[in-house]
Amino acid sequence: MAGLPLVGDEFAGYRVRAVLGRGGMSVVYQAENLRLSSVIALKVLAPELASDDVFRARFLEESRIAASLNHPNVIPIYDMGSHDELLYIAMRYVSGTDMRQMIKKRGRILPATALFLIGQAARALDAAHRKGLVHRDVK
């Protein structure tokens, strides 16, 4: 089984440009779709997860369901699959920062802003739940 891709590598038709984030289960990259010359976010799961047949089947099924979601608060999925025995999801790249970085940079946010942002996240989770998906890593 191959290791995770490195910046500059070609992976499943995508050229890895930068690492956007790392977690216990995956690495998210900024990548270029080589067929369309478009920028995407590429999430590649840890190699040890791809070797677990139960996890692999669940991942592929949940990815198909997630790709069917059409909601303004849900990032669209463009592609998913397996490459060099690693599981991946290609999705819309959204530039900017996450909530943790925003608070770190700006300090506390106003309660009205927090409610607005939490409301958007809740609507996205509700759309997923209606399709039978449960997000396992809400922070």
Label each PLM-derived region with a short phrase.
Residues 1-139:
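Conserved ATP-binding/catalytic core of the eukaryotic-like protein kinase fold
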